Amino acid sequence: MRAPRLFAVSLLIFIPTLALASDAEWRRYVIPSTGTSVDMPVSIFTSDGGAPESGTGRRFFTEDRRADLTVQSVPNPENDSPATFLAKQRPPAGIIYKRITPDFFVVSSIRNDRIWYNRCNRGNGTLNCVLINYPAAEKRQWDSVVTRISNTLRG
């Protein structure tokens, strides 16, 4: 009797998270000064966190602040390739996923039980990026959200 009850409780806990991407309200966010744009789930990232630490754009948080999304354009005055730009940023050890092309780079790592995902597209004098971080324990629930955000980054 205890196992079915435990299963029911875990369903109640995870059902809202499991429906994350499919039930989300999505809108296009545009950085006016650069034209960089991305689809973002406005029903998930409900709090405006203001300007990012570097570059132009915006930072957003979930209501409980367990996850955040930054959309930004970072100056690339030397027009470095994505590989060179990434190397200059000196990414941390522990990268679990990396893909670099002439047009973009993607890196992901786990730090402090959080997944950090970063995609930057090469622009004209900028790198246009999305940075997403969320609890590692919720990876499966966030996969479709991260994929859609990443695949819709333009600029």
Residue ranges and their predicted role:
Residues S22-E53, L153:
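N-terminal "mature-domain start" segment
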Residues S47-S144:
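Conserved polar/disulfide-associated segments of primarily extracytoplasmic proteins
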Residues W26-R28, W116, T147:
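Acidic/histidine-enriched, beta-strand-rich ligand/metal-binding domains
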Residues W142-R154:
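Short, low-complexity, Pro/Ser/Thr/Gly-rich segments in the mature regions of secreted, periplasmic
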Residues M1-A8:
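Bacterial N-terminal signal peptides that target proteins for export
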